[in-house]
Regions:
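Rossmann-like NAD(P) dinucleotide-binding subdomain of oxidoreductase/dehydrogenase enzymes
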Residues: 1-140, 262
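ALDH superfamily catalytic-core signature
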Residues: 67, 74, 106-242, 261-265
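Short, solvent-exposed loop/beta-turn-alpha elements that line the ligand-binding surface or hinge
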Residues: 248
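Cofactor-binding beta-sheet edge motifs in enzyme active sites
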Residues: 252
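Glycine-rich nucleotide-phosphate-binding loops and adjacent flexible coil segments
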Residues: 255
């Protein structure tokens, strides 16, 4: 570029300082490690606030790292407690220069509004859609989407919540999908024969139940499932869910999938 002759440009990457990491319950070790490793490797200190429902994995990871003797004193801290109390302190404290958050959209928006000029890294949820085209390998598509719908009882940000299936294959796809769902084994996750376990607590299961009941009351069709037993909610498939229902607009975070038929994109 004219005027740039004999000039040198370069980037200098420097640690940001203290990173605040706020993690969810659904992957209590993996998602903590995802934040701790890069933060330390880049020369930062990090304060981890794990979900109050699953703090032990973060504590054990920190214990292992600190007992190794490889970390300078004080660069890794784990603080447990309510997110509304401890999380707010981390987000607002000017000494914390970056917030890394994995969790729901509403909490992410709240953090963004409070963080000021801090750097922010977020992994947020959604009511994730999958499109199945007419040339899809039917059996593979069914198997992949059943697993995507009900893995971890739907408690992950990659949960298949909305399935848009082309009209040309809709009927055979749905028949196979329902049959595979009916064969899904629900029970104790310590049993290797179990496909799907319970939700994190009964409040979460009741929330899923309420969202499904709302959709059914609004005219949705229940193809399979729709039953709660304590913290367990059966793998559930619906169609004709009205767009105004919370199930069509919000992340359900449970084992529920909605089927849609389409002809053109």
């Amino acid at each position: 570029r004219p005027g740039s002759e004999h000039r040198l440009g370069y980037f200098v990457r420097e640690p940001v300082g203290i990173v605040g990491a706020i993690t969810p319950f659904n992957d209590p070790l993996n998602l903590v490690a995802h934040k701790v490793g890069p933060a330390l490797a880049a020369g930062n200190a990090i304060i981890v606030k794990p979900d109050s429902k699953t703090p032990l994995s973060a504590l054990k990871l920190a214990e292992a790292l600190l007992s190794s003797g490889l970390l300078p004193r004080g660069v890794l801290q784990v603080i447990t407690g309510k997110g509304s109390e401890i999380g707010d302190v981390l987000v607002r404290d000017p000494r914390v220069r970056m917030i890394s958050f994995t969790g729901g959209l509403e909490v992410g928006q709240d953090i963004a509004g409070k963080a000021g000029l801090k750097k922010i890294g977020m992994e947020l949820g959604s009511n994730a859609p999958v499109i199945v085209m007419p040339d899809a390998a039917l059996e593979l598509a069914v198997e992949a989407n059943v697993r995507g719908a009900f893995w971890a009882a739907g408690q992950n940000c990659l949960h298949v919540q909305r399935l848009l299936v082309h009209d040309a294959i809709y009927e055979p796809f749905v028949a196979r999908f329902i049959a595979r769902t009916a064969a899904y084994r629900v029970g104790d996750k310590l049993d290797e024969q179990t496909d799907m376990g319970c939700l994190i607590n009964e409040a979460a299961a009741r929330r899923v139940e309420q969202m499904v009941d709302e959709a059914l009351a609004a005219g949705a069709n229940l193809l399979i499932g729709g039953r709660r037993n304590g913290t367990f909610y059966a793998p559930t498939v619906l169609e004709n869910v009205p767009a105004a229902c919370s199930l069509a607009r919000e992340e359900v975070y449970g084992p529920v999938t909605i089927l849609y038929r389409f002809c053109t994109l």
